[in-house]
A protein has these predicted regions:
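A short, Lys/Arg-rich alpha-helix, primarily the initiator
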Residues: 1-15
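Key DNA-contact positions within bacterial/archaeal DNA-binding proteins
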Residues: 32, 42, 61
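Short alpha-helical DNA-recognition segment
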Residues: 17-36
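Short, charged recognition helix plus adjacent turn
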Residues: 54, 64-71
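Alpha-helical residues within the helix-turn-helix
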Residues: 14, 25, 54
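Residue-level detection of the helix-turn-helix DNA-binding "recognition helix"
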Residues: 14, 28, 39, 68
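DNA major-groove recognition helix of helix-turn-helix/homeodomain DNA-binding modules
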Residues: 28, 47-62
Length: 71
């Protein structure tokens, strides 16, 4: 799951032509936090994951590769 998160963040950030610093500013965190997440050293909190997903224009499920199954 973490590997998918790091890859998705990097790909989506590149797609939007954002630097780590720009992503961090828009999400309200430090560039160091974004770097730690992309390096796989940190898993974001729920709130941060929601903010990152919004800035990156993806769903949280897409960030974490969560498959939703119908009941």
């Amino acid at each position: 799951m973490t590997e998918h998160l790091t890859t998705t963040m990097k790909v989506q950030r590149a797609r939007l032509d954002l630097t780590q610093a720009e992503l961090a500013e828009r999400a309200g965190v430090t560039r160091k936090s974004v770097n730690a997440i992309e390096a796989g050293h940190m898993v974001p909190s729920t709130l941060l994951a929601l903010k990152l997903a919004k800035v990156l224009e993806v769903t949280v499920e897409e960030l974490f590769a969560i498959e939703l199954r119908p009941d």
